[in-house]
Amino acid sequence: MLGLAVLSLLHTASGQTIAKTDWPQFRGSGALGRSDGAGVPTTWSDDTNVAWKTPLPGPGASSPITLGNRIFLTCHTGYNTGSGGAGEISNLKRHLLCLNLADGKIVWDTAIPALMPEQERIREDHGYASSTPVTDGERVYVFFGKTGVFAFDLNGKQLWRADVGSTLNGWGSATSPVIHKDLLLVNASVESESLVALDKRTGKEVWRAGGVQESWHAPALVTTPEGKTEVVVAMMKKVLGFDVTDGKPLWSCNTGINWYMCPTPVTHEGIVYAVGGRTPNGGLAVRAGGRGDVTGTHLLWKVNKGTNVPSPILHEGHLYFAHENLGVVYCLNAKTGETVYEERLSPSPGQIYASPVLVGGNIYYTGRGGRTVIVAAQPALKVLGEATLENNRGAFNASPAVAGKRLLIRSNKFLYCLGN
């Protein structure tokens, strides 16, 4: 029998305004990975400072999002879940879950069978549920690769499905959708080498821009000094800017990064900050609002420091990020690109896929085993502490989310709510 709290969630799930304390998309409002709140713990373990811990139906690298007293999260079941044999790929399903923020109970679970054929044997650390949902307060939108883009109401009822491409890739699909006014923006680089805008109410395609290659991140929105909004993607060798209203290509900037781009760029005051690449990494800042090839006019700086997976944090004129493999964290001067510090964390979080979050002046770097190292967000490295879940032997590939004074961290097995 459903508890009163769950019944309340169902009865009131008719839409609400996004609050400042909500975390409505990948990396929170504006995709900046930051919260102005305070009180999030800086220490925890499997036995301390855990408000609740909920077993998940299956693994995933997607992040939780929040809307009021609800959490939305994806996972997959039926195939290659890391428990026992791989199973039959025809049994693959992706799930959108709704959980109660107060106690972690699963309110509803909507499963979507995969559209065959599907990519077999995607590595377990990437899997089939890597895209983070997004909400506008009335609906929840998810991207499940070639299976499609979906809209659900807040009770888990499917409202529409849209097809953005059918190409497969051995790394799977990972980009998270974002919302701009009435548009749902989807980076379908894997599925069709395109950036697609859908009408969020109907799922109908509004525009499509091609030529987006080797790009694995959420689209980034930037406002120019003239007040115009552009949508930006970083891809192999280039950063591209498009008119968000019609998808018209506006500008491109050569990066010198000759491999794929995974980290989501951050934007501030008309400037796009991007890091990425695999071997070698790189980073740059480019001013939006140009036309054509802006490499010689709008590129502000370029460095040979970057990271392959986690996205950066921009805070008080500095860009912070972690190398995914080396245990090294960086602080760059956001105006010049000059290295302020480049130091190895001790204790080491291990390999990092999760993007950091900034809360109350602290940056949280979460390693894939389950150890989080907390540092001060200042231009001199100061380690404040570390906290570990699952004996640092788990599978934590997702970026944390902030819910008021609590931190939400998911592994392949559990969703944790950390705080009092």
Place the predicted regions along the sequence by residue.
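Noncatalytic, solvent-exposed loop/strand surfaces
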Residues: 13-420
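Bacterial N-terminal signal peptides
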Residues: 1-11
